[in-house]
Amino acid sequence: MTRLVLIDGNSLLHRAYHALPKTLTTSEGQVVNAVYGFTRMLLKVIKDLKPQYLAVAFDMKGPTFRHLEYEKYKEKRPEMDTELAAQLPVVKELLESFEIPVYEIQGFEGEDVIAALIAQSAKRKVQSQVQSSKLGGLETVVVTGDRDVLQLVDERTKVYAPLKGLSNPIMYDAAEVQKRYGLTPEQIVDYKALRGDPSDNIPGVPGVGEKTAVELLQKYGTLEEVFNHLDELPERQQKLLREYRKQAELSQKLATITTNAPVELDLDKCRVGDFRSKKAIEALKKLEFKSLVRELEGGEGLRSERPKQEEQEDAGQLELLEI
């Protein structure tokens, strides 16, 4: 099946920034640890997943529609480090040199943009580069470290997520989601409605922990059915769920990734090309990513070896990025 890979740019860049030391700089002192880690992971994704189409989605600065629903949404999340923020435009310039399209829309998170692109891709018929037959829709793989996106998993959509830093990625289909979390992809939203999500300041139901939320959904299936069977629950759970029902319903709304972001999937622009273009090589040279330049200029594809000098500079951290 023809494959479209959609990368959650903010998630990957954030992970790269925290996985690699800030001592990874250019000769002029420009910190490029996040850019380097992002680029390494990008090339690993291309090597491992072999997509025919590829795009990257980013958040945009400013409030989203979720902030309009709940002013305290993500209230406790600290501002992006200035050294990370400075690398965001650098990554976008690098993606442009690779001719990889970037999608971002004010008022929506990157996850919403990805969901909208997935919804559109499901309706497309594309010519397979491997087969001559027409295929209805695309297989889509979302690359992200954010487990919220697991709610998008279905028969045509998978999530490729690193377990630690940027290493040991797992390919989530519906069976893998069930195996690891005891829930179906469709239940992820209702789980967050009950449990909440401290990282996004989604309140959930106070007193309902991870174990209880999973048990309730395993027994009743959905948040609505949990409320339909309150009389069957222990008195304490009944009291909490009755008292915080509106808060749970708000949390459900906040946790739901929407598919209505106003973006348009352009498969022609997303088609994966040759990254050994002069423009791409020059962009890597400017950032002084010598090993990547050697790999691409040598025409040997995405090699697993890396220069010893760079390995030493990375202070033992780049084993997370070996490809």
Stretch-by-stretch model annotation:
Residues 1-124, 136-140, 149-173, 246-250, ...:
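Noncatalytic, basic helical substrate-engagement surface that gates or grips nucleic-acid strands
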Residues 41-42, 145, 238-240:
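Glycine-rich, charged/polar anion/phosphate-binding loops
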Residues 50-52, 156, 169-323:
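Non-catalytic nucleic-acid-binding/docking modules located in mid-to-C-terminal regions
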Residues 64, 144, 212:
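Ser/Thr-centric signal marking residues that sit
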Residues 122-138, 299-312:
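Intrinsically disordered, low-complexity terminal tails and inter-domain linkers enriched
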Residues 140-146, 288:
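Conserved RecA-like ASCE P-loop NTPase motor core of nucleic-acid helicases/translocases
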Residues 145-148, 198:
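A generic "binding-loop/recognition-motif" signal
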